[in-house]
């Protein structure tokens, strides 16, 4: 299959360095302390944050001078064509751990001792890039909850398919067997918080793909800031009304 035509267009009409359309909204779960929906093309994730609140495991209360961050990732059974129960499969466990570690890097846990923060993520539609979409949704939900953070945690992926670097792979591209690099950054601090690669690449090629994913992260960070600023304006307008 030809994933990039002679005119330089991918199957969905994007250029190699174009992201899918991003749609995001906060405050979508009324009972949560913070929540968000984040869409990248046809991939859609909802995040809900509860906390900081008292540690539910009493044995850990005296041991923790930092907040405990817990994360649960799941996929809605209608999100893919796979009907098997996915909530407790190995991929969900692995992604829950990766997302938790990524969010711990941005949360100022030392300001909330003896407490816990719960992050729940559910993939409503899966079309590639679910890991990055979950991290971006979690960041929005944490900000919506007023959780203190040292920086935004943002993520994007890029791949290398048929000798071409591609930003923000969709499911068809991701399933084609090329390399996929997922990057998470703290943009203001200029730090990498996540780096995962599912295939070997020559160093020069890796650097190209990594740089492409990093640029995607910066664009997502800008979009997340816009969403949060717009939400702040709406809240101020309601208070003034």
UniProtKB/Swiss-Prot annotation:
Gene3D superfamilies: GHMP Kinase, N-terminal domain
Disrupted gene: phenotype observed: Aborted ovule development after the first mitosis.
A Gene Ontology BP annotation from the UniProt entry: rRNA processing
Family annotation (Pfam families): RNase_PH, RNase_PH_C
Top-level taxonomic group: Eukaryota
Subcellular location: Cytoplasm; Nucleus, Nucleolus; Nucleus
Principal place of residence: cytoplasm
GO molecular function, one term: RNA binding
CDD domains (alphabetical): RNase_PH_RRP41
Role this protein plays: Non-catalytic component of the RNA exosome complex which has 3'->5' exoribonuclease activity and participates in a multitude of cellular RNA processing, maturation and degradation events. In vitro, is a processive phosphorolytic exonuclease and requires a single-stranded poly(A) tail on the substrate RNA for its activity. Can complement the growth defect of a yeast mutant lacking RRP41 exonuclease. Required for normal development of female gametophytes.
Subunit: Component of the RNA exosome complex. Interacts with RPP4.
Official protein name in the record: Exosome complex component RRP41 homolog
Species in which this protein is naturally found: Arabidopsis thaliana
